[in-house]
Curated annotation (Swiss-Prot):
Cited function: Specifically methylates the uridine in position 2552 of 23S rRNA at the 2'-O position of the ribose in the fully assembled 50S ribosomal subunit.
Cited NCBIfam families: PRK11188.1 (NF008390)
GO molecular function, one term: rRNA (uridine-2'-O-)-methyltransferase activity
Protein name as catalogued: Ribosomal RNA large subunit methyltransferase E
GO cellular-component term (any): cytoplasm
Localisation per UniProt entry: Cytoplasm
HAMAP family per record: RNA_methyltr_E
Binding positions (S-adenosyl-L-methionine): G63, W65, D83, D99, D124
Enzyme class (EC, first level): transferase
Reactions performed catalytically: uridine(2552) in 23S rRNA + S-adenosyl-L-methionine = 2'-O-methyluridine(2552) in 23S rRNA + S-adenosyl-L-homocysteine + H(+)
EC number: 2.1.1.166
Length: 209
């Protein structure tokens, strides 16, 4: 993508962002990002998080999903969040800053989880987009593979998984992998997800491995 096209695309995104209904609603409700509404919509349909549950939130910054998760899990629940970017503290959220593709960060995250298994793994991770599908799609698929691997390491039997996936090369194969690990897998496109985005969310329940 040329610099000129990238600048035009960035300007269009900024205009859409500030005109966006969900951006304005997030600001009104004190939510850190419009992404919070995606998890709220998923929760309304699939009831993933309940009081007292332990939740891992991957790609958490700036904290929209963690805000929703900690409210749903309640005082007796636990939310462990991780992102390569910094995130302002949220009461009830144990946040680890680091790139969990790196072994030392992954080990630190597993230490936070401890010996007990978790009930829900959330992933809203996305790579820094270059504008080239040949570069961006493999990066995105690598992240969702890591999120599924996290499920294999920490998720309790019958646990749940919600992950953002970009449709493209590797998408169908990934769905097959998720279906092998969970009893039920649904594809969701929340209303708050921009229509032109290739992102969808796989919502998997009944972890069975």
């Amino acid at each position: 993508m040329s610099a000129k096209k990238r600048t035009a695309s960035s300007a269009r995104w900024m205009q859409e962002h500030f005109d966006d209904h969900y951006v304005k609603l997030a600001q009104k409700r004190g939510l850190r990002s419009r992404a919070a509404f995606k998890l709220e919509e998923i929760q309304q349909k699939d009831h993933l998080i309940r009081q007292g549950m332990t939740v891992v939130d991957l790609g958490a910054a700036p904290g929209g999903w963690s805000q929703v998760a900690v409210k749903l899990a309640g005082d007796n629940g636990k939310v462990i969040a991780c992102d390569i970017l910094p995130m302002d503290p949220i009461v009830g959220v144990d946040f680890l800053q680091g790139d969990f593709r790196e072994e030392n960060v992954l080990n630190a995250l597993l230490d936070r989880v401890g010996e007990d298994k978790v009930d829900v793994v959330l992933s809203d991770m996305a790579p820094n987009m270059s504008g080239s599908d040949g570069v961006d799609q493999p990066r995105a698929m690598y992240l969702v593979e890591l999120a599924l691997e996290m499920c294999h390491q920490v998720l309790a039997p019958n646990g749940c998984f919600a992950v953002k996936v970009f449709q493209g090369e590797g998408f169908d194969e990934y769905i097959k992998s998720v279906k092998q690990a969970f009893k039920t897998v649904k594809t969701r496109k929340p209303d708050s997800s921009r229509a032109r985005s290739r992102e969808v969310y796989l919502v998997a329940t009944g972890y069975k491995l």
